[in-house]
Amino acid sequence: LKEVLNHWMGEGYAYTTVKKVYIVLNEYFRYLTQQEILTKNPMNSVPMIKKSNFMAAQNKEDLPTQETVTVFTPEEIEKFKAEAFSKFSNGKSKYQQPAAYLLMLNTGLRTGELLGLLNSDINLEGRYLEVRQNVKEVCRREGTDYVPGREVKVGKTKTATSKRRVPLNEAAAQAVRELRQERDFGPTAPLVSDEKGDYTRPVNFRKRYYRILKAAGIEQKGLHSLRHPNVKPKTHIFYI
């Protein structure tokens, strides 16, 4: 039964949907035990996974409702930028690929879309990039069975309309240049790659972002806050 719930979680079903399945199964087996068809309710040994863990397993953020509409103020953007590009006393950057967050801010890309960008998807001369794919983390599987651990999966964009051409302003173009200067594994490699030239794990990208927020003294905001100005037409866009 636990494998059934994990299956639906791994397939990307919403937490509320899986929880409803859990409740229905629990009620069903409770009825069977009351009718003495079963001696024990098997659901008693199958606890419902915590929402925070469930969301993390699906590469989603379990954030309070108010945070979903929180945007950066101009002052917060300056603080974020200062911390993101700060260096240690020896001159080494504190954070990897800080320009990636500026690229999100100036293009409205989703996290998975940004991490799925290949260098070949970007045309600096034409000042645009092509969103073609999406990166997410999923539970590992061996055949039809789930095994411990998670892996990066590259696939289609969230929706059909998500596959699009995005214009680049000067701030976004400069962010691309800085990312390539820091790490460039060629045209077929991800723009925001890990040290080996592979796709960056979304969880690592998020953790780095939250470390910057904390160090800069900015209240916690989801990564979607960086793209919020670009998906809400009436919201002022603060270019960095």
Where are the language model's segments positioned?
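C-terminal catalytic core of tyrosine-transesterase DNA break-rejoin enzymes
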Residues: 34, 99-113, 204, 208-211, ...
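N-terminal core-binding DNA-recognition domain of tyrosine site-specific recombinases/integrases
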Residues: 1-42, 89-93, 199-203, 219-222
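Basic, Lys/Arg- and aromatic-enriched nucleic-acid-binding interface segment
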Residues: 19, 38, 44-111, 115-117, ...
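Short, contiguous acidic/charged loop-to-helix segments that flank catalytic cores in large enzymes
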Residues: 87-94, 153-163, 193-200, 217-225
